[in-house]
């Protein structure tokens, strides 16, 4: 008779990378991704915003991590019945694109770009920015992430740019924009200002050593409050930016700070009293002197002589003022003011009528206003300035100052602070509203809401949105070129531009947009012209415009946008609280008075195994494609998304991929092993599994109950955006499925009779694999697909199982069935997956098992049985007693033993003991010990921790209703745990996980027990020989054992047992198919086996 195989031949050592490539081809050939969207037409939608990356570099592990998270929730919401569009997007404009183009073209700086030609430069940017688009698609596809590349949006597309113009004009009309000359973080390497939040991206602060200099400024008049008289009065100021001293226009002191008048020769030095000791050497002090003290308020209004003559006639300058930003700490208590290079400096000087000076050009070099430093980069000028101060007699001290200093996020060069003209969004006008709207957002981790993001919103500042660069959406602002006839025009659409300028606008980029000019309508002479300002948008404004920009709102898709805003979900790494998340929030609040998204995950960063940032230069990470080809992408997905990185913490990943291999071994393989077991034995028996939940077998009921619990836990976890818990639920289920259900059901699968009990076992295992394949399909999309397809290798789902009618014949009552008698158990035959004809697991509906009722009593009891068995096996391991060695007994000591007696045979068989003994005198074997949760209790009672610890060790506590009394305090349930500990003289003991029961293994070995252990060893040796000989699991064999060790007694007593377990018969004088040599108690044994 032909053996019909209903399932594919599955190898236990699968090539998972090859398997994944087959699945990817299946998806592509059958257009599964598009089907998953089309099948949900008419259903409610799950709105997902895909943050646009730059395509001028290859994706790294951070991109893959974000992509995995995006894919999990998009797939999950799809099988939950939602329509989930996944349109990819590209960030195309801004510094990243320009810097890459400059590198490729071999040019650097604004002047070089202008000489090269803006049109040619931007054309190169346009081509360069999508350089790695195909590589991105390869990586994203290989990681099993489904996105729509064909309809991707690009921030450089005309439609997207027009929506950005609309947003700008809307803000302008609302009075939320203004133009100003203000001091900002400035990248001299990129020749552009940066927003304050850009200095907070990617840990842009670096430790830097600068030369700090203390300088003496000569007062123009004596300080009248002193009792003595001096030839000269000098006030000391300290700065870490000597290069700003040529631009000094004022000094600031603290009104309430004490200042000491320190005499040296005929000069009186004025310095904050708290700093005098720091300058003892320079001022010739012994430390015993007493000085006259005055308040800073007494210094206000005094004039001093300029350090240099560059701006000595600058109006209203060179006075001492009070500044509330001057506090005690570093320095001298005196701050030098250069309003062109400091925010506080500018604000204070502006209030005193002092106009700023800024003798530094766009590239960070001094201009001709400082002739002896002209053309010198500011940081390179420090030494020359210090030398000049020494020559003039104004220098007092130079020291090395190490501090965290902001660097450019693109070039990693140190920033300067510099006054530049810019357009600003009045974020401070509506920041309180942003704080309110933030309360509508669910943040993961939760603390981001009120801390990382919330605090940032509370301290939000006006946002500089203009950049004096080339490749970007141009600011739609035209100004009159004649200040006599001022006029500003702001445009919010192409239609408005075409109407006013009378030309067809086909490209909004520079230089084409710059060529649009027209006569100034407000100039009666007709001589002045309206010309566009040169600035382009900060690229963060464009990425923040993504929700409406991708839809070309409000010019098209108005209803679509309103239905798709805000997003249900977005995810990026935590620094985007200062980046994309923030700009989305600013623009959404200002334009729509709504939060831009409702759920947001802030994941952590991936570092190398030593905690360093992943870097091509350091060569400290493997190419992700290499890992995919070696272990598969599902393994990398699990590695990342089951870790704390999804909770905002760091993930250290090794270059060699050991972590991913461990995931493959510990997570993926157990899933595959269960599937392999099913297909192997089902094919051997020519049986088909059916989707059926009606078996009364206690192991079947237990594993199906555990299945539903796992399915519910996965659903609950993913509903709460918690992949970590979801993966744990999958792993925990397959641990029980493999190491308990399948192991305890082996006899049912192995027996030759194809009875109802055997069919029930196959149905139950099939139902578990089928259901979990769907439930975990978002978490491991490719192995789930492989299992799902394999289970449907030769047929559609079982119609009977789905119809709700059962054709399963009831088993006769057994001892195991009695274990669930009297316990409410609703027989179920259906799984809630109505789309039973789906060709892909990702086209199914999430399983609910609504017609199957969990047997909680059975689960609790069986979990206790597992606890007993796992503890017993651990004790065996500790005592070096192999599992095949029988033991006399196990004692279970508990007040509640009745529910375990029905499982006595199972316990005896699993842990290999002859008897189970029950006791209830727990107090004779163990006692409760108090374990304190120090982090939790320490928050509430830090002052009593020492006393509580001492009392807990002495046993001076009492369990009371609702808690535990100790040291006059009542501890809450999450602040302590009572642990059951066996007395030290009790051997072979362990407490249950619930700390209410104890087990004790009898570890004494009698000769009879040892003999039986040898018999079991022989069985294992024969089974291994069968496997090594590549025999089928159904092959019957002949066995011959040749040994220097006398085995006759063992064979006489246990021969039948050995033959039954190995499908063998003892024989002699045959030609073996396979021979092996093994050791039994240091004696050599030769095994010969042959198919019979």
From Swiss-Prot:
CDD domains according to UniProt: Anticodon_Ia_Ile_ABEc, IleRS_core
Single annotated GO MF: isoleucine-tRNA ligase activity
Cofactor(s) required, per the database record: Zn(2+)
One Pfam match: tRNA-synt_1
Top-rank EC class of the record's enzyme: ligase
Protein biosynthesis among keywords: yes
Motif 'HIGH' region, chain ranges: 53-63
Gene3D superfamilies per UniProt: HUPs (3.40.50.620), Isoleucyl-tRNA Synthetase, Domain 1 (1.10.730.10)
Family annotation (NCBIfam families): ileS (TIGR00392)
Protein name as it appears in the record: Isoleucine--tRNA ligase
Gene name linked to the record: ileS
């Amino acid at each position: 008779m032909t053996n019909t195989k209903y399932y594919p031949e599955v190898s236990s050592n699968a090539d998972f990378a090859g398997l994944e490539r087959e699945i990817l081809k299946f998806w592509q050939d059958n257009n599964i991704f598009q089907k998953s969207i089309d099948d949900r037409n008419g259903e409610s939608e799950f709105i997902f915003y895909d943050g646009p990356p730059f395509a001028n570099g290859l994706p790294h592990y951070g991109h893959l991590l974000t992509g995995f998270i995006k894919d999990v929730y998009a797939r999950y919401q799809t099988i939950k019945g939602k329509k989930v569009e996944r349109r990819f997007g590209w960030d195309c404009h801004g510094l990243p694109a320009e810097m890459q183009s400059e590198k490729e073209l071999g040019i650097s700086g604004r002047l070089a770009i202008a000489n090269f030609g803006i049109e040619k430069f931007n054309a190169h940017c346009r081509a360069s920015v999508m350089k790695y688009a195909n590589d991105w698609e390869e990586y994203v596809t290989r990681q099993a992430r489904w996105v729509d590349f064909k309809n991707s949006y690009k921030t450089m597309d005309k439609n997207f740019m027009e929506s950005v113009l609309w947003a700008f004009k809307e803000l302008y009309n609302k009075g939320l924009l203004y133009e100003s000359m203000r001091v900002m973080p400035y990248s001299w390497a990129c020749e552009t200002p940066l927003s304050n939040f850009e200095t907070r991206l990617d840990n842009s602060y670096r430790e830097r050593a600068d030369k700090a200099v203390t300088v003496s400024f000569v007062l123009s008049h004596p300080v009248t409050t002193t009792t003595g008289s001096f030839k000269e009065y000098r006030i000391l100021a300290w700065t870490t930016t000597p290069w700003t001293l040529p631009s000094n226009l004022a000094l600031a002191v603290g009104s309430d700070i004490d200042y000491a008048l320190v005499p040296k020769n005929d000069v009186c030095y004025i310095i904050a009293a708290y700093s005098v000791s720091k300058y003892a050497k320079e001022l010739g002090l012994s430390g015993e002197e007493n000085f006259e003290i005055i308040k800073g308020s007494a210094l206000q209004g005094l004039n001093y002589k300029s350090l240099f003559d560059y701006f000595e006639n600058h109006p209203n300058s060179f006075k001492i003022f009070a500044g509330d930003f001057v506090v005690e700490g570093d320095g001298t208590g005196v701050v030098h003011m250069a309003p062109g290079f400091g925010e506080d400096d500018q604000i204070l000087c502006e209030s005193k009528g002092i106009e700023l000076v800024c003798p530094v050009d766009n590239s960070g070099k001094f201009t001709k206003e400082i002739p002896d430093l002209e053309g010198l980069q500011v940081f390179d000028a420090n030494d020359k300035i210090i030398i000049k101060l020494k020559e003039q007699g104004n220098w007092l001290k130079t020291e090395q100052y190490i501090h965290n200093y902001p660097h450019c996020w693109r070039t990693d060069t140190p920033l300067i602070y510099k006054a530049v003209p810019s357009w600003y969004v009045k974020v401070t006008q509506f920041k309180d509203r942003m704080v309110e709207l933030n309360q509508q957002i669910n943040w993961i981790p939760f603390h981001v809401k009120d801390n990382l993001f919330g605090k940032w919103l509370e301290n939000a500042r006006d946002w500089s949105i203009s950049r004096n660069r080339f490749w970007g959406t141009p600011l739609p602002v035209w100004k009159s070129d004649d200040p006599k006839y001022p006029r500003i025009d702001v445009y919010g659409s192409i239609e408005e531009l075409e109407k006013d300028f009378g030309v067809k606008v086909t490209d909004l980029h520079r230089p084409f947009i710059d060529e649009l000019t027209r006569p100034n309508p407000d100039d009666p002479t007709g001589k002045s012209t309206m010309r566009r300002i040169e600035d382009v948008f900060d690229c963060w404004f464009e990425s923040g415009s993504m929700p409406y920009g991708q839809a070309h709102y409000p010019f098209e898709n108005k209803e679509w946008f309103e239905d798709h805003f805000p997003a249900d979900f977005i995810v990026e790494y935590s620094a985007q609280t200062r980046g994309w998340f923030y700009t989305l929030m600013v623009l959404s609040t200002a334009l729509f008075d709504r939060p831009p998204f409702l759920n947001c995950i802030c994941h952590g960063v991936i570092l190398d195994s030593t905690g360093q940032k992943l870097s091509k230069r350091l060569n400290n990470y493997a190419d992700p494609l290499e890992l995919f080809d070696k272990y598969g992408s599902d393994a990398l997905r699990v590695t990342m998304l089951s870790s704390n990185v999804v909770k905002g913490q760091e993930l250290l990943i090794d270059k060699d991929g050991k972590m991913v291999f461990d995931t493959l071994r510990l997570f993926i393989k157990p899933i595959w092993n269960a599937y392999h077991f099913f297909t192997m034995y089902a094919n051997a028996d020519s049986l088909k599994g059916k989707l059926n939940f009606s078996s009364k077998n206690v192991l079947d009921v237990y594993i199906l109950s555990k299945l539903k619990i796992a399915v519910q836990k996965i659903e609950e976890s993913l509903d709460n955006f918690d992949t970590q818990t979801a993966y744990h639920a999958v792993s925990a289920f397959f641990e029980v499925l493999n190491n308990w259900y399948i192991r305890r059901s082996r006899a049912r699968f192995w027996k030759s009779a194809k009875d109802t009990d055997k069919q029930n076992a196959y149905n139950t295992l099939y139902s578990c694999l089928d259901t979990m394949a769907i439930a975990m399909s978002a978490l491991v999309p490719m192995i789930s697909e492989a299992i799902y397809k394999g289970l449907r290798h030769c047929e559609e789902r079982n119609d009977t199982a789905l119809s709700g009618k059962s054709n399963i014949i009831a088993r006769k009552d057994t001892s195991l069935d009695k274990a669930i008698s009297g316990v409410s158990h609703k027989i179920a035959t259906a799984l809630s997956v109505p789309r039973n004809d789906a060709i892909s697991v990702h086209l199914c509906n999430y399983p609910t098992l609504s017609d199957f009722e969990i047997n909680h009593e059975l689960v609790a009891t069986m979990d206790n049985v597992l606890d007993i068995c796992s503890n017993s096996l651990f004790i065996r391991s500790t005592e070096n007693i192999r599992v095949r060695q029988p033991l006399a007994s196990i004692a279970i000591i508990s007040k509640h033993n009745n529910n375990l007696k029905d499982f006595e045979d199972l316990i005896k068989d699993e842990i290999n003991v002859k008897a189970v003994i029950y006791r209830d005198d727990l107090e004779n074997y163990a006692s409760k010990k108090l374990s304190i949760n120090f982090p939790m209790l320490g928050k509430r009672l830090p002052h009593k921790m020492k006393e509580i610890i001492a009392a807990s060790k002495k046993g001076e506590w009492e369990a009371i209703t609702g808690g535990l009394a100790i040291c006059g305090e009542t501890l809450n349930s999450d602040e302590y745990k009572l642990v059951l500990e066996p007395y030290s003289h009790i051997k072979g003991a362990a407490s249950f996980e619930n700390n209410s029961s104890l087990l004790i293994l009898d570890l004494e070995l009698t000769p009879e027990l040892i003999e039986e252990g040898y018999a079991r060893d022989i069985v294992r040796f024969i089974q291994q020989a069968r496997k090594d000989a590549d025999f089928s699991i159904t092959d019957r064999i002949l066995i011959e054992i040749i040994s220097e060790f006398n085995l006759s007694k063992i064979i006489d007593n246990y021969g039948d047992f050995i033959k039954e377990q190995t499908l063998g018969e003892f024989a002699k004088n045959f030609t073996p198919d396979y021979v092996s040599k093994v050791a039994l108690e240091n004696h050599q044994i030769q095994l010969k086996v042959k198919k019979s």
